[in-house]
């Protein structure tokens, strides 16, 4: 804005006006040359044709309106150089919009004119069909003024592409590229599905296929390596306890107290016994499968005892039927039975070792001499047999104890329930379902008052009645 200076003279007023005019914004659009686009409108309906022509002229377009596709084609043949844009309807009487579009695209003089289709059908199939045939745009009726105002952009784009042919190859419509890709992928997928099963992933580019094949091979190798590592680790875990326990059992067998003569007998005769011992006894009570291991060890121990007493091996069905009762009774007292089994097995193992030493010494010495060692061995054998008998008796007593405890618990719960039922019945008898009254005097007064059909009635004095 210019400076405002108040002066008395006329020269001062003129200077103020000149400054204000110079400060105004200059609109350069007035000086630029205006280019008017010429549009060929093809519409069969009269009213819509008149409305669209009015809107286009309001947006500074020159309009040539035609009601028929054949008339539009004749206009294009005569004045193709005077038309910049074609706006046509799909449903036309003589030649349809698709046929007109095909004629325009095939003609050399008209193929550079952008064709815009318009219709009331908003289906995607129709849009794709028109865009594939070469339409520049697809407008859905009713159309807006803004859509008609922006039609010049299509003409501008065609002119820029015509001037620069290298840009034409780079800036093809994205919709056309996508449609071509979708058609190719559909054809390829059909071809591959006919040839093989759809379980395998199919890639259409060779580079992508090679990359994915390489990835699949790498993934297989990695999976194989991890599988081998896990298998080695599992094998090491399985082998480790057996070797440890076997070494320990051999060290225990070959002791300094038995002498050098027993090394051979221990190493040969007791390896099988060590393996059976490890199978029968559970290695740890804290394992997740200790319950099942205890039941298996109990079954094997009972079968061995029955066979030793009877002397005849029994069938597996008979032994299984007899063992069901024992295993069901042993559920509550597992720890005591495990300790007794371990003690009895250790005693029997020692007795076997001592017996083998005695027999070896008898075979080596020609003269039968009873030494202190033999007497001690016989005493330990007797003690071992007594301990095994005590262990069996302890097992039977331990199986009987939980039964007694369960029966006592059931009796106590039953008696408690009966007492609660008796208490409830007595309480129900003592209940009074009458209305509780807070003040007894009011209750008496209410009972004394006369009632008629359940409602109170006022009493009238006899004196008042006589006077009246």
Swiss-Prot record:
Localisation: Nucleus
Positions with biased composition (Basic and acidic residues): 315-327, 371-382, 400-409
Entry keyword Phosphoprotein: yes
Keywords annotated in UniProt: Biological rhythms, Nucleus, Phosphoprotein, Transcription, Transcription regulation, Two-component regulatory system
One GO cellular component, as annotated: nucleus
SUPFAM superfamilies per the UniProt record, alphabetical: CheY-like
Post-translational modification: Phosphorylated. Phosphorylation varies throughout the diurnal cycle.
Biased composition (Polar residues): 168-177, 194-203, 328-364, 458-468
SMART domains: REC (SM00448)
CDD domains linked to this entry: psREC_PRR
Domain of life: Eukaryota
Pfam families: CCT, Response_reg
GO molecular function, one term: DNA binding
InterPro entries membership: ARR-like, CCT_domain, CheY-like_superfamily, Sig_transdc_resp-reg_receiver
Domain Response regulatory: 38-156
Secretion signal, residue range per the UniProt entry: none
Other remarks in the entry: Regulated at the level of mRNA maturation and alternative splicing by SKIP and PRMT5. The expression of APRR9, APRR7, and APRR5 requires the presence of LWD1 and/or LWD2, indicating the existence of a positive feedback loop within the circadian clock.
Cited function: Transcriptional repressor of CCA1 and LHY, and positive regulator of LWD1 and LWD2 expression. Controls photoperiodic flowering response and temperature compensation. Involved in the positive and negative feedback loops of the circadian clock. Expression of several members of the ARR-like family is controlled by circadian rhythm. Regulated at the transcriptional level by a corepressor complex consisting of ELF4, ELF3, and LUX. APRR9, APRR7, and APRR5 coordinately act on the upstream region of the target genes to repress their expression from noon until midnight.
The protein's name: Two-component response regulator-like APRR9
Species assigned in the record: Arabidopsis thaliana
Gene from which the chain derives: APRR9
């Amino acid at each position: 804005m210019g400076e405002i200076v108040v002066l008395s003279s006329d020269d001062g007023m003129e200077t103020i006006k000149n400054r204000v005019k110079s400060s105004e914004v200059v609109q350069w659009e007035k000086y630029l040359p205006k280019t008017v686009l010429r549009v060929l409108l093809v519409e069969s309906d009269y009213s819509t044709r008149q409305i669209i022509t009015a809107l286009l002229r309001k947006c500074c377009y020159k309009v040539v309106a035609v009601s028929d596709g054949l008339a539009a084609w004749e206009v294009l043949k005569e004045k193709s150089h005077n038309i910049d844009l074609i706006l046509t309807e799909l449903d036309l009487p003589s030649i349809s919009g698709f046929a007109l579009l095909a004629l325009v695209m095939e003609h050399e003089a008209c193929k550079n004119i952008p064709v815009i289709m318009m219709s009331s059908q908003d289906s995607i199939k129709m849009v794709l069909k028109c865009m594939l045939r070469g339409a520049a745009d697809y407008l859905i009726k009713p159309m807006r003024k803004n859509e008609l105002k922006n039609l010049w952009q299509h003409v501008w784009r065609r002119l820029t592409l015509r001037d620069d042919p290298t840009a034409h190859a780079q800036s093809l419509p994205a919709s056309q590229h996508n449609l071509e890709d979708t058609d190719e992928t559909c054809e390829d997928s059909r071809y591959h599905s006919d040839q093989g099963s759809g379980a395998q992933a199919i890639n259409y580019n060779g580079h992508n296929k090679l990359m994915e094949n390489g990835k699949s091979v790498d993934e297989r190798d990695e999976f194989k390596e991890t599988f081998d590592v896990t298998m080695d680790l599992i094998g090491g875990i399985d082998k480790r306890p057996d070797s440890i326990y076997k070494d320990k059992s051999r060290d225990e067998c070959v002791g300094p107290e038995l002498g050098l003569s027993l090394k051979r007998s221990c190493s040969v005769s007791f390896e099988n016994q060590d393996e059976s011992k490890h199978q029968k006894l559970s290695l740890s009570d804290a394992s997740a499968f200790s319950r099942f291991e205890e039941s298996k060890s109990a079954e094997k121990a009972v079968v061995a005892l029955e066979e030793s007493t009877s002397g005849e091996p029994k069938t597996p069905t008979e032994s299984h039927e007899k063992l069901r009762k024992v295993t069901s009774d042993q559920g509550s007292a597992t720890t005591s039975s495990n300790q007794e089994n371990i003690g009895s097995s250790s005693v029997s193992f020692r007795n076997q070792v001592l017996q083998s030493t005695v027999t070896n010494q008898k075979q080596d010495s020609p003269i039968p001499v009873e030494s202190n060692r033999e007497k001690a061995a016989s005493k330990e054998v007797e003690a071992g047999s007594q301990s095994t008998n005590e262990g069996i008796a302890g097992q039977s007593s331990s199986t009987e104890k939980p039964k007694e405890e369960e029966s006592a618990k059931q009796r106590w719960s039953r008696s408690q329930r009966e007492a609660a039922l008796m208490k409830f019945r007595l309480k129900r008898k003592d209940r009074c379902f009458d209305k509780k009254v807070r003040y007894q005097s009011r209750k008496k007064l209410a009972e004394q008052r006369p009632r008629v059909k359940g409602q109170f009635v006022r009493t009238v004095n006899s004196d008042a009645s006589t006077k009246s």
